[in-house]
Amino acid sequence: VKLWSGDFYSPASAYAESTYFTSRYGNRRTYIGQGTDLRIPGFHTGLDFGGGNGLAITAPAAGLVVFAGPWTVRGNATVIDHGWGVYSGFWHQSAIQVQVGEMVEQYQVIGLVGGTGRVTGAHLHWELWVNGIQVDPLDWLIQTYP
């Protein structure tokens, strides 16, 4: 069942221009082991928005909250099921403001930007999956999907 209608909007639209990205999907990057010299090369699986601690994160589209809690690397995290196999994930939050089982509307505040998990500073990391495959969230901001 499709739970959204219309376009997806930036989850950082409450505080940032839609092009205020600090790291884009697919960028090569090195993950830093906090407190160690560990460096792991990898593929960036989401879209990072700059921003200060405590700024509002909003739902890019309507959906059902299927996870809200802490993850080791991702920190405080929220996952929304938008239906039709489309899921959004929001990592590193300073505070989660929704609960599992809650239906959220587009633009609803779901959490606050933070620096939890494995990070070098406060930011919003947004991931998007379609039928279990990670895709570039930016595509969903600039195109309309059925």
Where in the sequence are the language-model features?
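Extracytoplasmic and endomembrane cell-envelope/extracellular-matrix remodeling and assembly machinery
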Residues: 1-13
